[in-house]
Amino acid sequence: VTTPKGPHLAVLPTAAQGETGSRAQVLQPSGWPLPKGYANGMAAEGRIVVTGGVIGWDAEERLADGFVAQVRQALSNIAEILAEAGARPEHLVRLTWYVVDMDEYLANLRELGKSYRATFGAHYPAMALVQVVRLVEKAARVEIEATAVIPR
């Protein structure tokens, strides 16, 4: 929704049929360029679901081979954690990515986008990307924290 005196608010279809409550809103200040692959901000009301730092390993704690594969597995792990709380990808309001090599991230944007959309569709919450020296699991290349809000 564009208003003459306020920010653009894009209402996301977060409430499924029969679900009640508010919907998440993408916050896009007037005049700002549209971001690609993330939102500048989100507003939502409901039950908050927060993950810890999620890395790209499977249930047997085996890390996927390579950066893109680790991202794919981490995103899948996040989807499973959200499902435990009854949350769906469209309930995501924030992702914080920690990577050990920013150049590796930037060199793989196309594949990362495909992996992201395969897991979460075209829903892009607020995101931050931070390069770190290393992660707790020495061979991990990426760790992602997620916050979701399930509408009431």
Per-region residue spans from a language model:
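N-terminal presequence-like segments and the immediate start of the first folded domain
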Residues: 1-93, 99-152
